[in-house]
Every structure is written in structure tokens, then in C-alpha cells.
């Protein structure tokens, strides 16, 4: 059997067997411990998330121009007839139902969350696409990229949590703008940042076994880099390949800043980072968390001294754009980047599942070695796993930015 076909067969088996293996235990794989659902914290009045201006690449991106019914870009808008959403439609034109596909997907996801959070209550849209000029100049409502929302019972005590649910549903910017509604917006359909997977900037630094530091873009298969093992201990792990490599891509990153000691890590919103709620948690119990969910007050693991690991409190989260995006894969599935411990994986929330799914690729590299030169773009095996995952895993296993689109 050809190696590529064998690898394809093994990858399918790994994904099919993963749910059963995840039930076995106890295990010492990072992220394997069962944990209660993460507590959702409502947004405060006038708070917005992420904590950057709406029309920056770290949020929904720049304004691209008003869309009119007779313009070429009108075909970018699609109607939303989801029966679980109430549209106010005070203009009686159906305009509030029109939005970009990205906005529609996020809104449909939010509608499910609202019904789960408050049985008998539905999501209500008071404003969607605006063709009448009722909003401020360069409002994303003019492009169908923004909605103003409430709950169907108009209970203002729910609006802070509604805003948090909108963040969780994958809106690129959420603002508790008014006591009468929540404002949500998304990136443009053309935005490269809207399609970003899980990566780090190419100039971010990894630590080699000899103590030298090297930019991620310069990593070569076979080099050993500082990482973390399943017991939460520092180790040096073989670098195998890039799961994604985009040297020229303009990419939106989340920048996580810590103090005591001060560290700064840039990574894409869908990437996994190991997080705890307090500094006393053992390293092995830090949970895999999407970068977009990391908040000030959380603790991450950082490298100190001669390779030791310790917790550091997150004091700031902001957006930044950079050229180049790289997603290294190591044998342990973790990597220390700019002295912060991160996962090699993104899009899927379970570190253990991702590590198991990449077992055939690790075996392939052990037996046959990797290619000398890797081309740009998404690694074929990573793309294959994502397609298999979409068929086999429930949508809520994915980060909202990478979840399969709803069909309503």
C-alpha cells in the first residue's frame, strides 16, 4: 500500500476511534481531564469585545463601502428566514433580514444559544442591513455586516449575557452599545483575516535544544524545540512540519500580554492556549482554550530561567496585524512561542482529540521522515482532517470562525 493511502486510512481510523479513547482514563495527556463548562461572564454596559475599535483588523475590519439594491455588491447579501429569530422590520421592506453569509452564520448560531440559555425566549433583530442612511457614516449596517439585537421578551437584565453569547457565537465585534440593544458585527467576506486558521507570526521565536532562539519561519524538520509534555513538564520535542504556512498573508492576531513575568504572545483567535483561572493550578490542569476566549485575569504558562514553566497573569488582550502566519507541529502537540506555552492546534477545542488525530502523521514522519522543503499553504493532512472532522464531529466542537455553515 502506498504511504499516502496508508496515512489516509490511519487518519480516518484515528478520528473514528478518538471519541471512544477520550472516554478511557485516567490519562496524562494535556487537556484530558474532564472539566465543568466554562462560566460565561456577561459584558458590562458600554463594554466591547475584543477590546479594540470595531473597524480594525483585530475586530471586524475596515468599512468597504455602502451596498445599495442596484449595486454589484448587493449579491453579497443573503436573506435570513430562520424561524427562531424575530426580525422587527419596521421599514416593511425585509431589509433587516439581509446580511452577509458570515453574519447570517453567526446570527443563526446565536439564536440556538439564546434558546438554550432562556427556554421560551428567542433572539430579536431590531436592525440589520440599512439602505436608508439612518446610521453614522461608514456604519457596517450599510454593508449587511452588522446587526442590533435584543431578546424577544425585551428583558434588559438579559442583555449583558446576550452580548457574551454573541461573542461565543463568533461575532468579530460585540458592543453593549445601548441599554436598548446589543450591537454585533463581522469581518468582510473578502477579508483574509476572516479565513485565518490557527497560526503565529513568522517572526515569533521558538527555543532550540541548544538554547538558541529561532524565528518560526526558519524551523526545519528534525530540530528539537522547547514544548510541554502531558504531565505539564518542559521538554524538547521534534518539530515535524508546518500545518499551515502563509509567508505573505496579512493576518489578524490576538496579542496576549502577561506580567510577573512579562510576556507577549501573538496568535490567531482560533488557536489553543493553555489557561487556568488561578495561579495555584498544576501545569497539567491548565485547560486548552481558544485565544479569542482568553481574558485579563486568566493565567497562562510561561518559560522562565533554564526552561522551567510557571503561571503568569494575563493583563491585556489586544489586536494586531502582521505579515506571515505559521503553524508548527511538534511530536508533543505543544510549543513554547515567545516564552509562552501554546498548543500546536486550532479550530477544534479538544487538545487530546487533535493530538490523537495527528498520530498517523507523527508515525509517518518517524518511519519515512518529512519532506526536505514544504510548500506554502495548508498541509494536505491538516486539510484532510478538517474535512473529516466536519463530517464526524458536532458543530460545537469547532471554534465559531471555523464551524461549518448553517443551512437555514
Swiss-Prot record:
The keyword Membrane applies. SUPFAM superfamilies: Hedgehog/DD-peptidase, Hedgehog/intein (Hint) domain. The record marks 198-199 as: Cleavage. It holds the Pfam family Hint. One of its GO terms (biological process) is positive regulation of smoothened signaling pathway. Its EC number is 3.1.-.-. PANTHER family: HEDGEHOG, INDIAN HEDGEHOG PROTEIN. One of its GO terms (molecular function) is patched binding. The record marks 271 as: Essential for auto-cleavage. Keywords: Autocatalytic cleavage, Calcium, Cell membrane, Developmental protein, Endoplasmic reticulum, Golgi apparatus, Hydrolase, Lipoprotein, Membrane, Metal-binding, Palmitate, Protease, Secreted, Signal, Transferase, Zinc. Zn(2+) binds at residues 141, 148, 183. Residues 1-23 form the signal peptide. This is Indian hedgehog protein. Interacts with BOC and CDON. Interacts with PTCH1. Interacts with glypican GPC3. InterPro entries: Hedgehog (IPR001657), Hedgehog_Hint (IPR001767), Hedgehog_sig/DD-Pept_Zn-bd_sf (IPR009045), Hedgehog_Signaling (IPR050387), Hedgehog_signalling_dom (IPR000320), Hint_dom_C (IPR003586), Hint_dom_N (IPR003587), Hint_dom_sf (IPR036844). It comes from the Eukaryota. Plays a role in embryonic morphogenesis; it is involved in the regulation of endochondral skeleton formation, and the development of retinal pigment epithelium (RPE), photoreceptors and periocular tissues. A lipid is attached at residue 198 (Cholesterol glycine ester). Expressed in developing midgut, lung and cartilage of developing long bones in the limb. CDD domains: Hint. The record marks 244 as: Involved in cholesterol transfer. Ca(2+) 1 binds at residues 90-91, 96, 126-127. Ca(2+) 2 binds at residues 91, 127, 130, 132. A lipid is attached at residue 24 (N-palmitoyl cysteine).
